[in-house]
Amino acid sequence: MKKIRIKLKSFDSGILHRSTKEIVMAAKRNGALVSGPIPLPTRVSRYTVNKSPHVDKKSREQFQLAVHKCLLELSSFNAHLLSTFTNFQLPAGVDISVEVRDE
């Protein structure tokens, strides 16, 4: 049995949530069994930089970048669903990777 594993990444959790809802609704309309969305751990990168280039070592600024991730698994799908995902329009800022697996 083949399964489709869809991983979504975004810097904005709201956009990621709306995109997963759209994908789940499209999959259910085409008769696929959906397991998920499964939230994956958020990767947070923190950066500390000096405010001044010369003196005042104690004066620093901190930035952070959070990457939110989510996983969907679809089973019992048809070829029409695959063509739907290739033409699917996601908002800017959402990265999608689609993987077809044999299980």
UniProtKB/Swiss-Prot annotation:
Q: Name one GO cellular component term.
A: ribonucleoprotein complex
Task: List GO BP terms, alphabetically.
Answer: translation
Return the PROSITE patterns for the record: RIBOSOMAL_S10
Parts of the chain that traverse the membrane = none
The record's annotation in InterPro entries points to: Ribosomal_uS10 (IPR001848), Ribosomal_uS10_CS (IPR018268), Ribosomal_uS10_dom (IPR027486), Ribosomal_uS10_dom_sf (IPR036838)
Give the matching SMART domains.
Ribosomal_S10
Report whether Ribosomal protein shows up as a keyword of the record: yes
Organism superkingdom? Bacteria
Q: Keyword Ribonucleoprotein on this protein?
A: yes
Question: In Gene Ontology terms, what is one molecular function of this protein?
Answer: structural constituent of ribosome
Listed SUPFAM superfamilies? Ribosomal protein S10
Keywords attached to this Swiss-Prot or TrEMBL record, sorted alphabetically, are: Ribonucleoprotein, Ribosomal protein
What does this protein do, in the record's words?
Involved in the binding of tRNA to the ribosomes.
Assigned protein family:
Belongs to the universal ribosomal protein uS10 family.
Assembly mode: Part of the 30S ribosomal subunit.
Q: What is this protein called?
A: Small ribosomal subunit protein uS10
What is the native source organism of this protein?
Neorickettsia sennetsu (strain ATCC VR-367 / Miyayama)
Q: What is the lineage of its organism?
A: Bacteria, Pseudomonadati, Pseudomonadota, Alphaproteobacteria, Rickettsiales
Instruction: Point out the gene that encodes the protein.
Output: rpsJ
